[in-house]
Amino acid sequence: SSSQTSSSQTSSSQTSSSQTSSSQTSSSQTNSVTVPLKFARYIPPKHFELTGDTQKQSFIKLVLPLILAVNDELLQRRKAVEAAVETNDRNMLDQWAVLYRIDPENFNDIELAERLLRRVDTIPVALALAQAAVESGWGTSRFAQQGNALFGQWAWTESAGMRPLAASNERAVVRSFGSLLESVRAYMHNLNTHQNYKRFRDARYRLKPKAEEAKASRLAVYLDSYAEIGQAYVKKLLAVMSSNNFDQYAEAKLG
């Protein structure tokens, strides 16, 4: 499991569909992929019997809808922040600041708004898919199977997760979740709040006007601190995104 700092769980956001164990993605190879509104709570046992490309496709069908759903939640949050900025609602901005681990007392209205807009934003779909694939072994790791842990997030309280067979810190556990969706939420909140990923967020802010398919590979280079292997981890993410054509999902939508 890759080494990574833990983050506090985001407050539960509402996702409007029922939980199911299967999902289908469009066969289109364009960036207008439509993904049915179906979510898996956990990785089904049959997934572990699959091999090769069949297992990879199964994993994508399980995880892609979850990534899109949480990105949609983040877009709604961003709109709420932008609305608070427009109306000069400092009380609401302060509440968002606390959730996104910013001390509001340190900033005036303009400074706080900019810092929030650097944090409350989506994660490129191809990048999230690649990290889930690498961190969970395409959904085959025992942490994914037993703890719904797709992204190898560390926690420091034993009751919060599962102990790895080898870890550089004896107190470290891989954080477990009640569902796969919770795992995706926590992963995105971690990238959006932890100090280790400030360079990632700053680069995302600069790339905001660019096309979505151009962002994943350009932002991956800022995730060297996600794993102990550093730049080798970045190279692995880039290889997974490229060899599996994950950019085809850059503009994917739930529908």
Regions found by a protein language model. Name each.
Residues 1-9, 14, 19, 24-130, ...:
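Catalytic cores of secreted/periplasmic lytic hydrolases that degrade extracellular macromolecules
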